[in-house]
Amino acid sequence: MEVGAPWLVVLIGAAGAGKTTVARRLFAPDELLSSDELRAAVSGDAADQRATRPAFAILHRELGKRLAAGRLVVVDATSVEQAARRSLLRLAAAARVPATAVVLALPADLVHARNAARSDRPVPTAVVERHLARVAALLSNGHAAAVDTLHGEGFASIVIVMSDGEVARLRLVRNALVSPR
């Protein structure tokens, strides 16, 4: 995956798919905006869904500022709903910043096992199932159709990973030459 700065990277996947692990492995802490961390900042509990609205208000405000300042920003949230992605892409477009979608479409049994193993913030099984269904719907007509859909939403590039092996092989290339400004 090749990115420049400014740039927006949107992680897409169910709770337990490994978005935070990927984000922490590939990006610097100051490049991340995590919905879980912002929920924790608002309410003291990363799993408190009542804090979602104020957490995302902070996320959107901070994202807009960082993109306008010419930064690389990674949004670590499920982003399985098109409306959620649309709000992020609007901010990127306003700052004239390209966006990359990273879709983590791992097997459901692996995602459920990871979610169950979370000691800090397990997500209800029904919620994980909804997330998995959204990701499956995105990929229901194959990779090429998913790429077309995400390009149509406004993503400049798309990465789809379907296994732990593909996640492990995911690499980041920082290239000033791909910057849009």
Language-model features: where?
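Conserved GTP-binding G-domain of TRAFAC-class P-loop NTPases and closely related GTPase folds
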Residues: 2-12, 17, 25, 29, ...
